[in-house]
UniProtKB/Swiss-Prot annotation:
Belongs to the Lhr helicase family. SsDNA binds at residues 122, 131, 145, 148, 152, 253, 255, 279, 410, 518-519, 528, 597, 600, 777. Changing R777A: Decreased RNA:DNA unwinding, wild-type ATPase and strand displacement on a biotinylated substrate. Changing R279A: Nearly complete loss of RNA:DNA unwinding, increased ATPase, greatly decreased strand displacement on a biotinylated substrate. This is Lhr helicase/ probable uracil glycosylase. Residues 35-226 form the Helicase ATP-binding domain. Induction: Induced by treatment with mitomycin C (MMC) (at protein level). Gene3D superfamilies: P-loop containing nucleotide triphosphate hydrolases (3.40.50.300). The lineage of its organism: Bacteria, Bacillati, Actinomycetota, Actinomycetes, Mycobacteriales. Keywords: ATP-binding, DNA damage, DNA repair, DNA-binding, Helicase, Hydrolase, Isomerase, Metal-binding, Nucleotide-binding.
């Protein structure tokens, strides 16, 4: 090796130099500087942006050393590469092949010995046999993860690491500031203890600040060379808004426009990554992008699965390239819930060009090579500047390429976050990174691990621990306290249940493991916390609780019984919280908290918050020209600049000042219930606002006696205060002495939800909550329960190490208390001012803070109409307009409420009518002048004239003329009428009533507005004889004063309307009450009315062959008795049904039928299928006792095509009689193996064996031998209708259970409308409701359906499409308003339109035999209620206690079927188990008999008969 300081490659061997110069033009600056430091043996931190060759910079020197022919053979690993991501580890292993293969080829070209360098990967995905192989034959280069390194160091595998010379830590910035990083730091120190000489450490990092902190993390106390060449990375960033006004949207949502624009961008580029900040948003975006792309391309989206998602989702939502036959699609999803295999497939598809786009969360943020990505799209501001750089850096990943990124804000205030992120990305001004200090739980875990294999000297271990950066300042007292914890020296006997893991001999200072310590460390080790969900169940006193959904652990800790939460489309009130579940009851229409899933997100850092505030303050001070120029520099495109300018202008108009880094705003306003909302507007982020909210909560309790939990977010704090009549607090609520704030927060955090969840994680990390079964995760509920029990004890001992650690984690890692203290200092020093304002409605920034309450509107249409309207009315409409665009109240207000309220205000209701002269006087005083006709409408008597004469004589009411009419006016109004509209004062009016008012016309119009519902300018002008312009000016002035509201309120009025502010509140409150009644679950009777109609029963619109095809599509795959198909099921749905229609569909190949089991000798179960989707609705053929005849028939049909029965005799069994062959064929038909191209054979079987020659079930003789040649003589005699037509093999059922489950979920949603556990059970779906629940939950995430409590008594896990729920609720009243009489329908008991015995249980009040969904049985429903159940032929009838009118309606419907020939005859022999002829007739049976006799049945010796 030659050394040349001027040449970066001069230190490498000739082989390596030749390969590099052949493959690359020149080293990058990062590579050149790194090789200089690494070749000197220095610990080195290489900081460079994505695409600068960092990985090769770290590896090439080590590879060159390994390729040296003179090196001594080693029995262990020499290069250890540690990656925070398993996927990144695999990616690096793949990329290492290039230099290894290249150097080998160069050696071979020169005739030199080829270097033999082995590479291995060990992670959680590595099979045990490969792990054992690596222990036996360690690779030269081992690629692993922090967790796998820990396991190797705590097992015999550590011996393979004793020869390590180089450790490379990739993406070091991703772990340095976390406990996972602290865990890795101790692992590296433990590794050094195994080595003769500490290994050289090389860290690879994206841009970080400060570099010295990451270098300290990497090497601890050892010196480190920092390689950080000037960043040559160029970013092309833009912020785009696709609409001109984000506050006035055509679709009430910005998402449709954003989605269309994203598709434009993706289609204009070769390869794109779309980043979203949540998994649910990623799923929905993927769905919509594919749908839009398909619509543009004219592609029909098929149903298929998304196998990479747990439970899956339709292929057209997020399938890749060719997914189960689906056409090429635009995007697939990539996030933590996607399986590792499918994530790899998505990555490979994008790299290879088979996929145009991936929609991802942070799962693609780190350095995985995604190939030639040329565009990154970020939806809403990224979580941090560093995250933004990482994400956009995915585009133009190669050296020297430009990274192009487009950001789409989700609402107006998100524009500010996007702008500041872009600004700081351009300057590289990222957030400060801080290494955690002294995490005692990590220390405890490693202490058990290090002592597990051999005794350890405590002093030596303490020194090793302190060499790592996270523990550099660890006090000996904390170390000893941790050893006490692990060795069983507890502060109280209450901790006796904690099992000591070590023996600590304080005399010798030796730590020795107790039995099981090593197993505990390897089965429960690691720093990544187990975080999970609480299951939510519907509480029931009588039934087993049914599942509703899931909630985030921290949200549960923040909730209490009585709180109302939102899950799916329904609000639920919490009744109980246990260790593993949350019990709820429906709270229809109540304002609810939306669930959150925080995970590891801790909010905006304080320094980024200061930048946001400074930016906002700066922009607010600029004139428009300077403003535009400033925005242009930040890449604002489209309508982004106008929207941001409008937002800041409106905020300044609302509060007088825009919140900034030096100005906080405390805004107060009343909500819809009259309570106060007090909002602190501050940009400093959740890490500052979270601890401040704790202190504010304490102040509310101590000073005001209010137990209210303020809500903190990145942009401020929201406090809700009940109206007590006093002035609500202002800035004083949020200002604390700088010296007292930390003790207050420290005291309060111990009782917070955050502390409870972090304590559990710390206790588990410290091995205090070991897994009961090695290799398996403990159920989280069990871990929570044990953690809660431990916390109950530990709270009493503040010095308990895990209590200290949980508090430290909350105060240092999650919260930023120092930044909060600094803010309090600034306030005290007047460097930060607080402005108090009181507003009538929320300011734009306040609207954004309250955004969580209306988040559901962002995907409008996801929820049923009543839920959307109720939620909207529960909010301030100005808030809705600010966030979502103009929302007209006419879309929300109930027209019936508007009409009834207007009638009340106008005294047009009976209870408000005038009953005497005094009542008339009150009318005139309250409503103003009225004509005599007006008064007559408002009186209960006819002697109005006498009453008016009396009032006139007493000079209490006077006739006046204006607007072309004569009016009666109260004498008190004469002055107003004179001064307001020029009415002359009648003679004799006392002077006291003619005094002038300050605003006479305003008073007149104000009263007019207060006494009616919405009205127009024209109506006002006509009422008072004014010009329209004059009326408009007065109304506008009153609106400015807040007395009137301008908008569109009533559907029967056109154009601009007005409404008194207080009247509008009444209308909203009453409409909300009405809507909440609608939001309540419908009764089971309503569902039973809905389902037949949903399935077209009784429809007059379903006709002809197309109508029949529609019906079959809905009923696809469901078994129905053949006897009911053409007598009841099809004719009741298709108005003009004829058997020829079905035969035509079968003959054309559009539809096919299959058998699903024989019923006796003359009936069987059949199902119908659309040919295109038949494999998804067919079941696998049933197992029968196959004979040679069966096999030959199947073999013949298996060749393809269709065969007449006569043709089937060829190749069958020699000597087989026609009857025997027919018998075998029908057995295959009923078993679901064979089908025909006509339904005629089934009809023939139904008509009976004597006429059709259909096979009877009998014992078969042993079949004769199989013949290999044609046996043409085996023929049937004549033409047998039971085997007419052509026969073919049914296509194979789709073997993939996931594919079937997804299609089945879609199919059952379409069949049942509201899908419940009972409905799925009745269908006999493989895997039952549990299987479909996973699929339906994924549909919900993708916006394909809603989960809610739509039908009472059917459990909380009900799924439906929003529009279906709207239709269901139209059956709330006694259904059909055009058919007020009883509506009866008789169905086959097996008909899918019969909800009883499926979604609904059978009534239990019958003392006779139990009803069931049996072939031949009938049910009679009257307005959805089950009235009768009749066994086949009607011989036994069960009645369920309906009134006489309902019984008569049922009897009429039943006899109509007999008359129409749908059922052949009717003979009722028993009613409720008692013979009809029994003379002892009770009241109920008498009602039934009367109904039947009245419908035309006659008494016979056997019973009641109708022919």
């Amino acid at each position: 090796m030659t050394t040349n300081g001027a040449d970066p490659l001069g230190r490498f061997s000739a082989l390596t130099r030749e390969w590099f110069t052949t493959a690359f033009a020149a080293p990058t600056p990062a590579q050149a500087d790194a090789w200089s430091a690494i070749s000197e043996g220095n610990n080195t931190l290489v900081i460079a942006p994505t695409g600068s060759g960092k990985t090769l910079a770290a590896f090439l020197w080590a590879i060159d050393r390994l390729a040296d022919p003179a090196r001594e053979p080693s029995q262990g690993t020499q290069v250890l590469y540690v990656s925070p991501l398993k996927a990144l580890a695999v990616d690096v292993e793949r990329n290492l092949r290039t230099p290894l293969t290249g150097i080998t080829r160069v050696a071979e070209r020169h005739g030199l010995p080829a270097p033999s360098i082995t590479v291995g990967v060990r992670s959680g995905d590595t099979p045990p046999n490969q792990r054992r192989a690596m222990i036996a034959n360690p690779p030269d280069v081992l690629i692993t993860t922090p967790e796998s390194l820990f396991l190797m160091l705590t097992s015999a595998a550590r011996e393979t690491l004793t020869s390590v010379r180089t450790v490379i830590v990739d993406e070091v910035h991703a772990v340095a500031a976390t406990k996972r990083g602290a865990h890795l730091a101790l692992s590296l120190e433990r590794l050094d203890q195994l080595l003769d000489t500490p290994a050289q450490r090389i860290g690879l990092s994206a841009t970080v600040r400060p570099p010295e902190e990451v270098a300290r993390f990497l090497s601890g106390q050892a010196p480190t060379t920092i390689v950080c060449p000037p960043a040559a990375k160029t970013f092309d960033l833009s912020v785009q808004v696709p609409v001109p006004d984000m506050a006035n949207l055509d679709n009430n949502s910005i998402w449709p426009d954003v989605e269309e624009r994203i598709v434009d961008l993706v289609e204009a580029h070769n390869s794109s990554i779309v980043f979203a900040n949540s998994r649910r948003l990623a799923e929905r975006l993927t769905s919509r992008l594919n749908e839009i792309h398909a619509e543009r391309s004219g592609i029909e989206l098929p149903a298929g699965p998304n196998p990479e998602v747990g439970g899956g989702a339709p292929a057209h939502l997020m399938g890749s390239g060719q997914a189960n036959g689906a056409p090429p699609l635009l995007a697939r999803a990539h996030h933590g819930s996607v399986s590792k295999e499918q994530r790899a497939q998505v990555e490979d598809d994008l790299k290879s060009g088979r996929l145009r786009a991936v929609v991802a969360t942070s799962s693609l943020e780190l350095g995985i090579d995604m190939g030639a990505v040329d565009l990154v799209i970020q939806v809403e501001a990224p979580p941090s500047v560093a995250s933004g750089l990482q994400r956009v850096g995915r585009a133009g990943h190669q050296v020297g390429e430009i990274s192009q990124g487009v950001l789409f804000p989700k609402h107006r205030t998100d524009l500010i976050g996007c702008a500041v992120t872009v600004q700081r990305m351009q300057t590289g001004d990222i957030e400060t990174l801080r290494v955690p200090a002294n995490p005692l739980d990590v220390l405890a875990q490693h202490t058990v691990a290090v002592a597990a294999l051999e005794p350890v000297d405590a002093d030596a271990w303490f020194d090793a621990v302190r060499r790592s950066a996270p523990f550099a300042t660890l006090p000996r007292s904390a170390f000893e306290a941790t050893l006490d914890l692990l060795s069983g020296k507890y502060p109280s006997t209450e901790f006796a249940e904690l099992r000591p893991r070590l023996v600590y001999d304080r005399d010798t200072g030796t730590l020795t493991a107790r039995p099981g310590a090593q197993r505990l460390a390897v089965t429960s080790g690691g720093a990544i916390p187990d975080r999970g969900m609480f299951t939510v169940y519907l509480a029931s006193e009588t039934e087993k609780p049914s599942r509703v959904g899931e909630l985030d652990e921290e949200m549960v800790y923040e909730s209490r019984p009585g709180d109302v939460i939102s899950l799916g489309a329904t609000s639920w009130r919490i009744t109980e919280i246990t260790h593993d579940r949350v019990l709820v009851i429906p709270a229809p229409g109540q304002p609810a908290r939306l669930p959150f899933w925080r995970g590891d997100s801790v909010g905006r850092p304080a320094e980024l918050g200061a930048a946001v505030g400074a930016f906002t303050g700066e922009l607010a001070s600029l004139d428009r020209k300077a403003f535009d120029k400033r925005c242009q520099k930040m890449g604002f495109a489209g309508y982004a600049t106008d929207n941001l300018h409008q937002l800041l202008r409106e905020q300044r108009e609302a509060t007088g000042v825009v919140p900034s880094d030096t100005t906080f705003v405390v805004e107060r306003f009343r909500d819809e219930l009259g309570d106060w909302r007090v909002i602190l507007h501050s940009p400093y982020g959740l890490r500052v606002h979270g601890p401040l909210a704790l202190a504010v909560g304490r102040r509310l309790r101590e000073r005001y006696g209010i137990d209210e939990k303020p809500t903190a977010s990145d942009d401020g704090i929201i406090v809700r205060l009940p109206d007590s009549g006093d002035t609500p607090p202002g800035a004083d609520l949020f200002v604390f002495d700088a010296d007292e704030i930390e003790p207050i927060v420290t005291a309060e955090v111990g009782g917070s939800a955050l502390f409870a969840s972090r304590f559990r994680e710390c206790a588990a990390r410290a091995l205090l909550l070991p897994r009961r079964h090695p290799g398996k995760r403990s159920p989280l509920w069990h871990q929570r329960q044990r953690a809660a029990q431990l916390l109950d004890i530990a709270r009493k001992y503040p010095d308990f190490p895990i209590v200290l650690e949980a508090v430290r984690e909350c105060l240092q890692d999650v919260y930023d208390v120092p930044a909060l203290i600094e803010l309090m200092h600034k306030i005290a020093q007047r460097r930060l001012r607080i402005v108090e304002v009181e507003t009538a409605t929320p300011s734009p920034f306040a609207a954004s803070l309250l955004f969580g309450y209306v988040g559901a509107f962002m995907y409008e249409g996801d929820s049923p109409l009543a839920e959307r309207r109720a939620a909207a009315l529960a909010l301030d409409t100005v808030l809705l307009s600010e966030l979502l665009g103009r929302v007209e109240l006419r879309e929300l207000l109930d027209p019936a409420v508007v009409a009834s309220t207007s009638a009340q205000l106008q005294h047009l209701t009976p209870e408000r009518a005038a009953r005497d002269a005094e009542g008339v006087a009150d009318l005139l005083r309250l409503l103003g002048p009225l004509t005599e006709a007006d008064i007559a409408q408002r009186c209960t008597a006819d002697n109005i004239g006498a009453w008016l004469d009396g009032l006139h004589a007493a000079k209490r009411a006077l006739p006046v003329t204006y607007a072309g009419q004569t009016w009666w006016a109260a004498v008190e109004d004469i002055g107003l009428l004179r001064d307001g509209i020029g009415v002359p004062v009648p003679v004799g009016v006392p002077a006291a009533f003619t005094e002038s008012a300050s605003d006479p016309l305003g008073d007149l119009i104000g009263r007019y507005a207060r006494t009616r519902g919405p009205f127009t300018t024209e109506q006002t002008a006509a009422r008072f004889g004014l010009g329209v312009r004059v009326a408009s000016d007065v109304l506008s002035r009153m609106a400015v004063d807040g007395r009137l509201i301008r908008g569109e309120f009533a559907a029967d009025l056109s154009g601009e309307q007005w409404c008194d502010a207080q009247v509008l509140k009444i209308l909203r409150r009453r409409s909300l009450a009405a809507l909440r009644a609608q939001v309540e679950p419908v009764s089971t009777d309503a569902y039973a009315r809905f389902l037949p109609s949903w399935q077209h029963v009784g429809s007059t619109n379903t006709t002809g062959i197309d109508g029949l095809a529609t019906v079959i599509e809905q009923l696809a795959g469901v078994p129905i008795p053949a006897s009911a198909v053409e007598s009841l099921v099809f004719p009741q749905r298709v108005r003009d049904y004829q058997p020829a229609m079905l035969d035509e569909l079968l003959a054309s190949g559009e539809v096919m039928w299959s058998g699903a089991g024989q019923i006796g000798n003359g009936d069987g179960w059949v199902a119908f299928h659309l040919a295109d989707t038949a494999p998804l609705t067919l079941t696998h053929g049933a197992e029968i006792e196959f004979t040679d005849t069966h096999r030959v028939i199947l073999e013949t049909l298996g060749h393809g095509g269709a065969y007449f029965f006569r043709q089937l005799t060829d190749g069958t069994v020699e000597g087989t009689a026609g009857q025997e062959l027919k018998q075998a064929l029908w057995e295959l038909i009923w078993a679901g193996w064979v089908t025909g191209d006509t339904f005629a054979p089934v009809r023939a079987v139904l008509s009976g064996p004597r006429r059709s020659g259909a096979p009877a079930h009998r014992q078969r003789q042993r079949p004769p031998r199989l013949s290999r040649y044609s046996v043409a003589h085996a023929q049937t005699r004549g033409t047998d209708p039971t085997v007419s037509g052509r026969w073919s093999a049914l296509p194979a059922a789709e073997p993939d259970s996931t594919v079937r489950a997804h299609f089945q979920a879609e199919l059952l949603l379409g069949r049942h409308g509201v899908l419940t556990k009972g409905a799925v059970g009745a269908e006999g779906v493989p895997g039952g409701f549990a299987t479909l629940y996973k699929v339906l939950s994924t549909f919900e995430d993708a916006g394909r359906c809603q989960r809610g409590y739509f039908v009472e008594s059917l459990g909380g896990a009900q799924f439906a499409v929003a529009s279906t729920v709207d239709r269901l609720r139209s059956y709330l009243d006694n259904v059909d308003p055009e058919r007020p009489e009883y509506h009866a329908v008789v169905l086959a008991a097996t008909d899918p339109a019969n909800p009883y015995g499926a979604a609904l249980g059978w009534p239990t009040d019958s003392e006779a035999h139990r009803p069931g969904r049996k072939a031949g049985a009938l049910v009679a429903l009257v307005d959805g209620r089950l009235v009768w159940f009749l066994e086949r032929g009607g011989r036994s009838l069960l009645s369920f206690g309906a009134d006489a009118d309902a019984q008569r309606a049922a009897a009429g419907a039943l006899t109509d079927l007999v008359s129409a020939g749908r059922i052949p005859s009717l003979l009722v022999e028993r009613i409720n188990g008692v013979a009809v002829l029994d003379p002892d007739v009770d009241a109920e049976r008498a009602v039934v008999q009367d109904a039947l006799l009245g419908a035309g049945l006659s008494r016979t010796p056997r019973g009641l008969r109708l022919r």
